[in-house]
């Protein structure tokens, strides 16, 4: 190394060298001259080696001459590979570097020692592993050690390799064909070293030989490359000649270096001629050429195995002399201590980084460099894994690594222990209070919240384990990467030990034992690190220590648990089945838990308790037990200590081990003795004596004996005890064994939240119902009925168990904490909420269930449907729904407060621990008991479904199903409340983290509104990440919140949520920026899918600042679909809320009976679905306050069969229009899925504003013609109309004279069809008409006089009348009123097929006027769009265009109205008689009565006022359509511009 070189004064002392004569000097004066020149040119100082011996002098001179430096190079792979060849093992050297190759350009030199590859230390790796690392990518970073750039080449090995090896590694540059070189070769003889000066001469001669050899090798490589490109005989001869020279040089170099070895004797084996003969016989030219890459630098490959063994030199030299040609492919032949046959030593020792045949070699795995590349490899190496664990424990949070290892431990555990391992895994890593909590997927977390861990089936165990292992694997790999970097810098533990293990790694038993022994020492160091943890982290450290020790045991490492860990193991796992490390403890535990009968046969523990010594004594003990139950609380108060001890041993086992008995033993009916054997753990300690368990009321209602002591619960009523005694006597009569009764205690007296689970587990199943009834009764029942009774029995008993759990929560926690004043009243409400209400509801439900059982004396419950409906529907449903929603929605806050208070308040923590240690909690924590209410609600529909499944009577089954549906409604209501509460909690957190400091007034005019944004005042609907694609080159990662009326686009920065405005330069206006608001109001939103990306969607907002189009990209297609659906739904909901229907005057009582068009209101009242409830995902833009959307409802008649026919045709029409809509959407452009027209064609075939104006004209005609109300009805109905400002209340003098112009404008805008005007002219128009062209000013609108009504009726539209449509007559035929006008479009008459000339199929998309009670609805369009008349007015006019065109209103409204111009004698294609019969005759059955004009003048005036306002809005809507068309054209042009720029 360069650090070991001498200083200048050391290298040049004052003493001059004294040269003695030598054979070499006397024979070769020329050589002496060359030697002096060489010394001068390389700063060679012979005095440095004058006092050294032969071996040391050689090494020191090399070190002095060639100072080694370490450097890092980066090689970029080119077409010819990396351009270098490596050789050697431990370490690996650069064998050769291609001329002008990638390695040479990077600065790699022949002879460089490779230290690291991509940061991985490879000094102890073989060349196969190094090549694999180099070839792993298109570039590689090498840390190499070698001569400084520009200095002469040096041997491949450094000073740690012996001189005898150096002679075979150093390339030389002198050509053997030069005169000087040939002369040197001829004069060189075996050196005779006489004195210290001759060592210098000898070294110089060796150097010359090396350079000659290297030059010849390089020449050979060039010749072979030329031969490969252009084979020629001349090149082949030169190659053979070079191959002859190389062995000669190697032989001389071997002799020169061999004489310097201590005790080395060179014995030539045969002349060179023989050698060449052998090589030619063994290897043909093809073979020689085939090994070009492997033979380019055959003079180097040191081996650490025998580099210090001088005896290996002669053996290798003998082999070289025998096989000189094959020695080209055998690198560093003198470094192998054992010489094998030639065929076994050729291929594996040299390989180039670009060698394509590398993959076929047998790949060796070196422990040090390879096992740390992957955790999978590391798991089988105990010592290496222990070092890695030490590194992670010392530097990081080891939770993810320990989670991964414990998951692996589960996979390698036998089936008997997997449940225990999973429970520990859940407690360590998945539980909310886990000390080593890791990130758990949301779905899995929600599933775990609903299940009790010990009741989860094994297939889910494996799924959860695999999921968690995959989730933490990336983090483990990051730890491994950090470890590799630290290890390369020498910052890790036990490096020398691992190096030795890697060198001896043969995977034999001895090596594995050494690894385990080494791992024991490293584990001890890990424990030392854990011991230094703070007191607050003691539990976490103990858990970490336990996990590490368990996994090390799995690997066979002998570890001893510290004393402080042994006594904690019972608390670490859920079950007492965890094996104890000390045999005595285990035996003691078994003695206390499993040897039940010896303790039973002993003396009783207390006089008040009884043992379960034999089944025959059960009745005597039962009789002796009841007086105790009926005693006062004071009579049992002296025994709390013993009863607690007794229950501690029994309940603990029942709540845990009992759950693991086979399921078939639970349901076995034939033998109660089998129950006793299977449940031996419960029989032993006397916790479930036979006499106790034979009374279900005692245990199920809260174990009154115990609760009297602890809770002061009232004793069970006498009738209850008598009922239970009767049940016991009934069972005893028929000889059923008693032990089955103990399951009463197991499942309901001592257990808990197993009610909330529906696994076939011992604790979940109630006592077998078949044991409660006589044998004769059972024989008279069908198997289906027996199943039904069992499910009913389970419903009753699990309800008892739930009541007991709620009482535990109330008495053990709530009452005590309130008495002791540990929490304030507000904190009590936050944690326990309305616990009293919940408890009373379930107590009442339990009492009603008991009453049902009492009235069925044979325990066979026949009818239960009515009772279930009473409990779960009507008032009972409402009470339970609201109470449970209040309690359960508070659950997230309660659990969070418990967690935070336990950390901050030591008094509260002590209380909780003390309460949870109460045996009545059955080892459940407070955080486990609170969710039991939610879990109970999930059980009801399942049980009721099972009851219905086994019910044979149809009426009864329907009642039970209906009750089950009500239970689901309760559950859904509560789930929604819980979700909203959780969302509210998250919104509060988001509001706390919201950062509005980036908002600037210059960027966005409404910045103050954004700064004052309060998320907590809204409800959150959805949230998640989205990517905002601003343009082709700019994307922004967003965290998006969908609230009830806005969409908020946030950016995550650290822990903040930043609200920031972004700008974009539009292609059409390159000189200005368009600023996008991060808050989008849903009342202005239209959503469309992006045609070119199925994960993206357009959110188009029409704000006060203009149109804003956001392209948002989701992570998956399903997520995009969810976002699109929710945004559409919420936008529709916001628009619906902002619009109210206009009430119309009610009909007289006599005419109300004949009204056929009342379904909208009827449906609203009956089904709770608003007229605009069904929303289409394709919404039109509108302002934030006005526009709503609604699909037309298929209104049905309440009493007539005509409704079915009409609904059928309405459904067909809707389907056809939806198909047309889908087809329209499919024809959108490539960049925008909006109907963007071509610039040279009309924008749209349908003009919704014109349609609306046309329909408004028809509405006006209808009202003017038919509406007449009495003064009384006007006064009654006036309350339905809100008060509005009127533009003009004066008499209207102008008649409606321009309806034909309205029709003309409509036709020219929508159909582009020629039509006949009043004068008979044919007019065709392709451009949209402006309002001034089509309509008169507003003040010209007035009521038509009576004598002009006939002409008003003549104003009809080709689009309304469809000649091709058949006549759909209602029952009773079509009367003169022509009521089809109010039916679906398909109901129009076909009596006049010749009328309406110029009509087309497209005209079938008519607008139907429906008068439904107090509401007027215009329908007939598919996607829905509403427009409000004013911010104060909510319109009931529902306009439904085919595709979404934004409807925007502004303060500047130009108001027009359609009018009629038939006064000029124009000929109409429709006669008044036909119109009256077909269109307006329906008024006989409507809610209106034709009155004289004088009687309804006020009403007509008010209606006309509303119509004027509608007209104004629709006129503006038409203008907006035109503006929107221009905007779409601009966007289309921008998209085309972007496309062309992309292509260019």
From Swiss-Prot:
SMART domains this protein is in? Answer: PDZ, PH, RhoGEF
Cross-referenced InterPro entries = ARHGEF12_PH, DBL_dom_sf, DH_dom, GDS_CDC24_CS, LARG_RGS, PDZ, PDZ_sf, PH-like_dom_sf
Compositional bias (Basic and acidic residues) = 28-45, 313-329, 582-592
Q: Where is this site: Breakpoint for translocation to form KMT2A/MLL1-ARHGEF12 oncogene?
A: 308-309
Q: Gene Ontology cellular component? A: cytoplasm; cytosol; extracellular exosome; membrane
Query: RGSL domain: which residues?
Result: 367-558
What disorder does this protein's entry note?
Answer: A chromosomal aberration involving ARHGEF12 may be a cause of acute leukemia. Translocation t(11;11)(q23;23) with KMT2A/MLL1.
Q: What lineage does the source organism belong to?
A: Eukaryota, Metazoa, Chordata, Craniata, Vertebrata
Q: Which CDD domains match?
A: PDZ_ARHGEF11-12-like, PH_LARG, RGS_LARG, RhoGEF
Instruction: Identify the residues that the record assigns to the DH domain, covering every copy.
Output: 787-977
Composition bias type Low complexity, residue spans: 663-676
Ranges annotated as biased composition (Polar residues): 249-260, 293-309, 330-344, 631-640, 1138-1149
**What tissue specificity is annotated for this entry?**
Ubiquitously expressed. Isoform 2 is found in jejunum and testis.
Which BP terms does GO give this entry? G protein-coupled receptor signaling pathway; regulation of small GTPase mediated signal transduction; Rho protein signal transduction; Rho-activating G protein-coupled receptor signaling pathway
- Where the record annotates domain PH, the positions are 1019-1132
Q: What does this protein do?
A: May play a role in the regulation of RhoA GTPase by guanine nucleotide-binding alpha-12 (GNA12) and alpha-13 (GNA13). Acts as guanine nucleotide exchange factor (GEF) for RhoA GTPase and may act as GTPase-activating protein (GAP) for GNA12 and GNA13.
Q: Which residues carry this modification: Phosphoserine?
A: 41, 309, 341, 637, 1288, 1327, 1377, 1457, 1541
Record's keyword terms, sorted: Acetylation, Chromosomal rearrangement, Coiled coil, Cytoplasm, GTPase activation, Guanine-nucleotide releasing factor, Membrane, Phosphoprotein, Proto-oncogene
Q: Which PROSITE patterns match?
A: DH_1, DH_2, PDZ, PH_DOMAIN
- Please list the residue ranges annotated as the PDZ domain: 72-151
For the region Disordered, what residue ranges are annotated? Answer: 1-62, 247-346, 570-706, 1138-1179
Protein name (Swiss-Prot/TrEMBL): Rho guanine nucleotide exchange factor 12
Q: Record's Gene3D superfamilies?
A: 2.30.42.10, Dbl homology (DH) domain, Pleckstrin-homology domain (PH domain)/Phosphotyrosine-binding domain (PTB), Regulator of G-protein Signalling 4, domain 2
Subunit composition? Interacts with GNA12 and GNA13, probably through the RGS-like domain. Interacts with RHOA, PLXNB1 and PLXNB2. Interacts through its PDZ domain with IGF1R beta subunit. Interacts with GCSAM. Found in a complex with ARHGEF11 and ARHGEF12; binding to ARHGEF11 and ARHGEF12 enhances CDC42 GEF activity of PLEKHG4B, and PLEKHG4B, in turn, inhibits ARHGEF11- and ARHGEF12-mediated RHOA activation.
UniProt-listed SUPFAM superfamilies: DBL homology domain (DH-domain) (SSF48065), PDZ domain-like (SSF50156), PH domain-like (SSF50729), Regulator of G-protein signaling, RGS (SSF48097)
């Amino acid at each position: 190394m360069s650090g070991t070189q001498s200083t200048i004064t050391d290298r040049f002392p004052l003493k001059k060298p004294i040269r003695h004569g030598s054979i070499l000097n006397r024979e070769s004066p020329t050589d002496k001259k060359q030697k002096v020149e060489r010394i001068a040119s390389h700063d060679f100082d012979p005095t440095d080696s004058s006092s050294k011996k032969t071996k040391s002098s050689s090494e020191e001179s090399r070190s002095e001459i060639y100072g080694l430096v370490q450097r890092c190079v980066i090689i970029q792979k080119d077409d010819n590979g990396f351009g270098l060849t490596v050789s050697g093992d431990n370490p690996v050297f650069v064998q050769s570097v291609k001329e002008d190759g990638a390695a040479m350009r990077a600065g790699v030199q022949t002879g460089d020692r490779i230290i690291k590859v991509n940061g991985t230390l490879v000094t102890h790796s073989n060349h196969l592993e190094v090549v694999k690392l180099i070839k792993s990518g298109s570039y590689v970073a090498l840390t190499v050690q070698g001569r400084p750039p520009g200095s002469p080449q040096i041997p491949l090995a450094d000073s740690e390799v012996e001189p005898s090896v150096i002679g075979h590694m150093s390339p030389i540059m002198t050509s053997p064909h030069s005169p000087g070189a040939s002369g040197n070769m001829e004069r060189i003889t075996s050196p005779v070293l006489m004195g210290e000066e001759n060592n210098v001469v000898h070294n110089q001669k060796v150097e010359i030989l090396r350079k000659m050899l290297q030059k010849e090798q390089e020449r050979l490589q060039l010749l072979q490359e030329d031969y490969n490109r252009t084979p020629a005989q001349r090149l082949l001869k030169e190659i053979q000649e070079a191959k002859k020279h190389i062995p000669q040089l190697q032989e001389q170099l071997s002799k020169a270096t061999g004489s310097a070895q201590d005790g080395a004797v060179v014995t030539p084996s045969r002349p060179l001629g023989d050698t060449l003969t052998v090589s030619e016989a063994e290897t043909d030219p093809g073979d020689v050429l085939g090994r070009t890459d492997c033979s380019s630098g055959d003079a180097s490959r040191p081996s650490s195995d025998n580099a210090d063994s001088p005896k290996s030199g002669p053996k290798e030299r003998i082999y070289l002399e025998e096989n000189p040609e094959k020695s080209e492919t055998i690198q560093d032949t003198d470094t192998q201590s054992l010489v094998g046959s030639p065929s076994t030593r050729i291929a594996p020792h040299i390989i180039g980084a670009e060698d394509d045949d590398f993959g076929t070699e047998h790949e060796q795995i070196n422990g040090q460099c390879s096992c740390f590349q992957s955790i999978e490899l590391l798991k089988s190496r105990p010592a290496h894994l222990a070092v890695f664990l030490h590194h992670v424990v010392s530097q990081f949070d080891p939770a993810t690594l320990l989670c991964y290892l414990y998951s692996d431990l589960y996979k390698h555990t036998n089936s008997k222990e997997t449940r225990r391992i999973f429970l520990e895994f859940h407690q360590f890593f998945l539980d909310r209070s886990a000390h080593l909590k890791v990130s758990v997927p949301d779905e899995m977390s929600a599933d775990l919240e609903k299940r009790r861990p010990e009741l989860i089936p094994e297939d889910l165990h494996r799924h959860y384990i695999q999921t968690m292992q995959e989730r933490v694997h990336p983090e483990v790999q990051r730890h491994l990467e950090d470890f590799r970097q630290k290890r390369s810098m020498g910052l890790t533990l036990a490096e020398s030990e691992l190096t030795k293990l890697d060198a001896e790694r043969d995977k034999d038993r001895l090596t594995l034992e050494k690894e385990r022994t080494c791992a024991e020492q490293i584990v001890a160091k890990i424990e030392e690190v854990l011991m230094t943890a703070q007191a607050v982290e003691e539990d976490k450290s103990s858990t970490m220590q336990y996990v590490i020790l368990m996994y090390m045991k799995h690997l066979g490492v002998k570890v001893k648990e510290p004393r402080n860990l042994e006594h904690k193991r019972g608390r670490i796992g859920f079950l007492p089945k965890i094996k104890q490390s000390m045999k005595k403890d285990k035996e003691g535990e078994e003695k206390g838990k499993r040897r039940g009968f010896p303790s039973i046969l002993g003396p009783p523990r207390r006089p008040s308790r009884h043992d379960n010594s034999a089944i025959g004594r059960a009745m005597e003990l039962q009789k002796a037990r009841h007086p105790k139950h009926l005693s006062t609380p004071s009579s049992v108060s002296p025994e709390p200590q013993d009863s607690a001890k007794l229950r501690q041993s029994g309940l603990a086992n029942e709540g845990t081990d009992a759950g693991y008995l086979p399921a078939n033993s639970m349901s076995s009916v034939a033998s109660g003795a089998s129950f006793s054997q299977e449940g031996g753990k419960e029989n032993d300690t006397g916790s479930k004596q036979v006499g106790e368990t034979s009374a279900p009321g005692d245990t199920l209602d809260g174990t009154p004996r115990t609760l009297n002591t602890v809770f002061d619960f009232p004793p069970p009523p006498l009738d209850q005890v008598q009922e239970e005694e009767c049940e016991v006597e009934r069972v005893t009569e028929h000889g059923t064994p008693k032990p089955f009764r103990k399951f009463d205690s197991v499942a309901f007296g001592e257990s808990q939240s197993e009610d909330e689970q529906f696994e076939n587990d011992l604790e979940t199943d109630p006592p077998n119902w078949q044991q409660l009834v006589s044998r004769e009764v059972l024989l008279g029942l069908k198997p289906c009925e027996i199943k039904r009774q069992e499910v009913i029995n389970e419903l009753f008993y699990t309800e008892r168990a739930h009541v007991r759990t709620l009482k535990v929560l109330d008495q053990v926690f709530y009452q005590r904490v309130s008495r002791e004043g540990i929490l304030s009243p507000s904190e009590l409400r936050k944690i326990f909420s309305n616990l009293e209400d919940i408890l009373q509801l379930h107590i009442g439900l339990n009492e009603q269930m008991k009453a049902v059982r009492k009235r069925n004396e044979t325990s066979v419950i026949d009818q239960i449907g009515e009772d279930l409906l009473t409990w779960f529907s009507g008032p009972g449903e409402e009470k339970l729904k609201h109470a449970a929603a209040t309690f359960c929605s508070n659950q997230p806050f309660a659990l969070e407060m418990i967690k935070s208070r336990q950390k901050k308040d030591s008094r509260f923590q002590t209380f909780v621990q003390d309460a949870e240690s109460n045996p009545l909690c059955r080892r459940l924590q407070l955080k486990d008991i609170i969710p039991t209410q939610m879990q109970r609600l999930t059980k009801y529909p399942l049980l009721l479904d099972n009851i219905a499944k086994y019910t044979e009577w149809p009426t009864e089954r329907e009642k039970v199903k209906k009750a089950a549906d009500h239970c689901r409604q309760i559950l859904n209501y509560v789930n929604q409340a819980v979700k909203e509460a959780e969302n509210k909690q998250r919104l509060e957190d988001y509001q706390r983290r919201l950062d509005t400091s980036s908002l600037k007034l210059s960027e966005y005019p409404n910045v103050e509104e954004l700064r004052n944004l309060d998320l907590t005042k809204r409800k959150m609907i959805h949230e998640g990440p989205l990517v905002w694609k601003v343009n082709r080159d700019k994307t922004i990662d967003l965290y998006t919140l969908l609230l009830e009326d806005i969409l908020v686009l946030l950016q995550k920065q650290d822990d903040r949520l930043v609200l920031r405005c972004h700008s974009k330069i539009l292609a059409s206006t390159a000189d200005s920026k368009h600023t996008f608001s991060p808050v989008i109001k849903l009342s202005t939103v239209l959503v469309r899918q992006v045609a070119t990306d199925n994960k993206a969607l357009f959110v188009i907002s029409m704000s006060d600042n203009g149109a804003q189009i956001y392209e948002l990209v989701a992570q998956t297609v399903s997520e995009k679909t969810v976002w699109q659906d929710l945004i559409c739904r919420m936008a529709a909901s916001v628009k619906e809320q902002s619009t109210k229907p206009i009430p119309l005057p009610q009909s007289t009582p006599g005419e109300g009976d004949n009204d056929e068009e009342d379904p909208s209101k009827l449906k609203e009242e009956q089904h709770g679905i608003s007229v605009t409830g069904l929303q289409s995902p394709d919404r039109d833009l509108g302002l934030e306050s006005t526009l709503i959307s609604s699909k037309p409802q298929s209104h049905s008649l309440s009493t007539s069969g005509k409704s079915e026919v009409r609904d059928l045709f309405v459904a067909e029409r809707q389907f056809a229009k939806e198909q047309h809509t889908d087809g329209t959407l499919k024809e959108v452009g490539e960049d925008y899925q909006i109907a963007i027209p071509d610039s040279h064609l009309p924008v749209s075939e349908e003009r919704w504003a014109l349609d609306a104006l046309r329909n408004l004209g028809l509405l006006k005609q209808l009202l003017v013609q038919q509406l007449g109300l009495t003064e009384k009805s006007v006064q009654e109905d006036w309350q339905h109309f809100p008060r509005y400002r009127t533009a003009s209340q004066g008499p209207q003098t102008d008649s409606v004279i321009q309806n034909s112009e309205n029709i003309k404008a409509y036709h020219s805008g929508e159909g582009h069809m020629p039509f006949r005007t009043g004068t008979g002219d044919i007019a065709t128009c392709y451009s949209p008409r402006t309002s001034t062209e089509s309509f008169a000013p507003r003040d010209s609108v007035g009521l038509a006089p009576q004598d002009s009504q006939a002409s008003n009726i003549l104003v009809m539209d080709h689009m309304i009348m469809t000649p091709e449509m058949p006549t759909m007559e209602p029952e009773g035929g079509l009367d003169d009123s022509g009521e089809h006008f109010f039916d679906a479009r398909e109901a129009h008459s076909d009596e006049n097929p010749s009328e309406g000339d110029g009509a087309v199929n497209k005209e079938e998309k008519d607008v139907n006027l429906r008068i439904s009670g107090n509401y007027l609805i215009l329908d007939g369009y598919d996607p829905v769009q509403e427009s409000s008349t004013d911010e104060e007015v909510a319109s009931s006019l529902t306009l439904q265009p085919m595709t979404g065109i934004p409807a925007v209103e502004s303060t500047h409204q130009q108001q027009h109205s359609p009018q009629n111009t038939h006064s000029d004698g124009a000929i109409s294609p429709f006669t008044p008689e036909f119109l009256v019969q077909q269109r307006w005759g329906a008024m006989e059955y409507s809610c209106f009565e034709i009155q004289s004009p004088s009687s309804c003048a006020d009403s007509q005036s008010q209606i006309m006022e509303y119509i004027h306002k509608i007209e104004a809005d629709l006129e503006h809507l038409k203008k907006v359509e035109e503006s929107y068309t221009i905007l779409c054209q601009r966007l289309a042009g921008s998209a085309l511009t972007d496309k062309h720029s992309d292509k260019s």
